[in-house]
């Protein structure tokens, strides 16, 4: 009865033709339900032959109906047994049953006959199947519980909402009490089929109830529903989320009829939940007993109690399968490693996982050590079981590995066979020399604050210390993250430069004095008395360019080295910020020509004084225009403009020639237009 599908098309009654004396036969096609009869997957509409005595005075070829309005009269199945009262009219039927009930009841009678034939076939196949105990599968055992289990009722529900109620033929139970939903008790062994919508008002506790109230529910979960599909003789899609109720006898039949080809690797545990009332005074309380009847679970035993749609089904609360409880076995990820290598790796990880001893700091304390303690002799030679101090990484207190853990792992210099004794001795010497040089930070950074400009080239300085400093220490300093600079002082000597002549030394001293003076004064203003002025009466001082200082060449016959020019440029940059830039006064028109000549003409060389008090011939080379003719034209234009302005002023005294010039700027607008 699995995967049955009702259709909206029903067959109407057909005329009954009289074949012989006193009996008539009518063939009615049943299309209210499509059944897959067999394993070939074909949908068949099986006609049913009805036999009944013809109604008297019924003309031939006229449709025969009953007085109830279009319903067939009471008919009997020729090949099946109809329970008494099954065809009588009912007043409590639902709307779907009252509509065209004649054809529907006829189809239901035929389906009951098919069910009985299918279960008979199942009994024959169960006897032909091999014993499951030979395959290593446990047979379900029958559980006996206290109580008067004189009879039981089976309720089976498929995926489309069809419930099948049956009464075991071997149990002496009052079948009339269990068939109260139908008018008339069914015969023994006959299945009652009705849609579950008609029985929605019934409680869910009706499944497998004993007369004394004992309820036995067997839940088939997962792929075990395939057995029920095979039992009905039809192949349908798996619907493991449905509840199938069965008596204990049905469980025994399941054990007899189960086959490995239907169970396979998808077989799961079968559970039976039995709820029995207590025999004592506490009759209202119930105790649930759950016992695993069959252990046929395999690798998919963890999916017990879940259907394909994820609906939970009552079953055992925990998996008792030994396969599910076995521990996962670890596989070797690196097959190249031998057991000895793996043991070494385990030892190293175990040593690293151990923390420092209690009360001992995991991080080294650098506050109490000097700047040279990072490269002490102890880091290489004094500790036999340790590593050099500069190799140790400071670990935090939050769970890192301490240097003691590294020492406990057996790491030492003997683990590096590539180093020879001579190389180790060189390493010790380099570390010792570096530690001696790093005792004082003042030897690394020169103190420029207390050293004057005269101490730049003295005897104790860069060259002497550079000659004494070993080359290997520079590379060692780079490896330790420090700046590779030579430990030097702030003093040097001119004797270290034998190529310099007396003139070069004189130039150096002069440049040194100029630089020192410029640094001391900075950007202070110098008195304008030292500036050169043209004797042009009321004119302002000419503007002096910041870069108008001419290079000082003491002796043109002597060669000058390139570094002297660099010193001269530095001096010029320092001096150019000390000159005052006087502004040109252009308040009067008569000074325009003079100012223009001073800016654009060729001024004569003038004597001036620099910031050091020396007299020099200053020529502002940058202020001289490269086009003198254009400059003269501009100067003449300025003079002509001044003369024209004077003429206009004299003509406008009476305001007759140009009347608008006597007005203000606003009054001039519109005058003379």
Swiss-Prot record:
Ranges annotated as biased composition (Low complexity): 278-287
Keywords: Crown gall tumor, Plasmid
Bias-annotated ranges (Basic and acidic residues): 288-303, 520-534, 638-673
Superkingdom classification of source: Bacteria
Sequence segments annotated as region (Disordered): 36-73, 171-216, 229-409, 478-497, 520-552, 585-673
Miscellaneous note of the record: The Ti plasmid contains at least six transcriptional units, designated vir loci, which are essential for efficient crown-gall tumorigenesis.
The name this protein goes by in its record: Protein VirD3
Protein's organism: Agrobacterium fabrum (strain C58 / ATCC 33970) (Agrobacterium tumefaciens (strain C58))
Lineage: Bacteria, Pseudomonadati, Pseudomonadota, Alphaproteobacteria, Hyphomicrobiales
Gene name for this UniProt entry: virD3
């Amino acid at each position: 009865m699995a995967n049955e599908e009702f259709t909206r098309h029903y067959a109407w009654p057909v005329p009954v033709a009289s074949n012989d004396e006193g009996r008539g036969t009518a063939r009615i096609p049943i299309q209210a339900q499509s059944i897959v009869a067999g394993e070939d997957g074909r949908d068949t509409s099986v006609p049913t032959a009805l036999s009944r005595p013809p109604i008297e005075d019924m003309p031939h070829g006229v449709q025969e109906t009953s007085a109830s309005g279009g319903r067939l009269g009471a008919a009997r199945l020729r090949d099946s047994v109809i329970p008494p009262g099954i065809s009588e009219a009912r007043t409590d039927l639902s709307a779907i049953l009252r509509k065209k009930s004649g054809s529907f009841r006829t189809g239901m009678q035929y389906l009951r006959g098919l069910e009985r034939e299918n279960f008979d076939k199942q009994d024959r196949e169960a006897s032909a199947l091999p014993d499951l105990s030979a395959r290593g599968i446990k047979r379900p055992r029958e559980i006996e519980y206290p109580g008067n289990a004189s009879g039981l009722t089976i309720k089976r529900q498929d995926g489309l909402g069809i419930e099948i109620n049956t009464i075991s033929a071997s149990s002496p139970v009052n079948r009339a009490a269990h068939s109260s939903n139908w008018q008339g008790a069914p015969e023994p062994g006959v299945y009652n089929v009705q849609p579950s919508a008609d029985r929605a008002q019934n409680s869910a506790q009706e499944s497998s109830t004993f007369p004394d109230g004992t309820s036995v529910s067997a839940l088939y979960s997962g792929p075990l529903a395939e057995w029920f599909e095979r039992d009905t003789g039809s192949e349908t899609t798996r619907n493991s989320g449905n509840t199938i109720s069965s008596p204990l006898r049905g469980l025994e039949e399941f054990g007899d009829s189960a086959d490995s080809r239907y169970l396979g690797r998808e077989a799961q545990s079968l559970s039976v939940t039995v709820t029995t009332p207590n025999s004592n005074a506490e009759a209202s309380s119930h105790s649930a007993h759950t016992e695993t009847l069959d252990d046929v679970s395999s690798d998919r035993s963890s999916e017990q109690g879940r259907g394909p749609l994820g609906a939970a089904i009552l079953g055992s609360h925990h998996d008792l399968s030994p396969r599910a409880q076995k521990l996962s076995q670890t596989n070797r990820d690196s097959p190249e490693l031998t057991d000895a290598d793996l043991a070494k790796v385990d030892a190293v990880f175990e040593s690293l996982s151990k923390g420092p001893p209690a009360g001992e700091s995991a991080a080294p304390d650098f506050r109490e050590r000097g700047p040279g303690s990072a490269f002490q002799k102890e880091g290489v030679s004094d500790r036999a079981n340790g590593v050099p101090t500069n190799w140790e990484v400071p670990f935090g207190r939050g769970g890192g590995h301490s240097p003691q853990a590294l020492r406990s792992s057996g790491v030492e210099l003997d683990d590096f066979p590539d180093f020879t004794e001579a190389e180790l001795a060189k390493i010790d010497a380099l570390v010792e020399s570096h530690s001696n040089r790093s005792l004082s930070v003042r030897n690394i950074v020169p103190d420029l604050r207390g050293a004057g400009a005269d101490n730049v080239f003295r005897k104790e300085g860069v060259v002497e210390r550079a000659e004494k400093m070993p080359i290997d220490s520079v590379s060692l300093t780079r490896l330790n993250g420090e700046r590779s600079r030579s430990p030097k002082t702030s003093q040097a000597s001119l004797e270290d430069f034998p190529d310099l002549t007396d003139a070069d030394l004189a130039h150096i001293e002069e440049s040194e004095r100029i630089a020192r003076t410029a640094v001391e004064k900075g950007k202070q203003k110098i008195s304008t008395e030292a500036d050169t002025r043209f004797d042009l009466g009321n004119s302002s001082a000419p503007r002096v360019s910041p870069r108008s200082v001419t290079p000082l060449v003491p002796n043109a016959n002597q060669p000058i080295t390139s570094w002297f020019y660099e010193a001269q440029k530095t001096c010029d940059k320092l001096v150019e910020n000390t000159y005052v830039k006087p502004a040109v006064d252009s308040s009067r028109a008569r000074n325009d020509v003079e100012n223009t000549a001073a800016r654009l003409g060729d001024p004569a060389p003038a004597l001036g004084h620099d910031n050091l008090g020396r007299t020099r011939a200053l020529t502002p080379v940058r202020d001289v225009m490269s086009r003198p003719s254009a400059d003269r034209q501009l100067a003449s234009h300025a003079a002509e403009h001044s003369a024209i302005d004077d003429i206009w002023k004299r003509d406008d005294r009476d305001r007759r020639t140009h009347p608008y010039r006597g007005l203000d700027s606003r009054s001039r607008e519109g005058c003379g237009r």
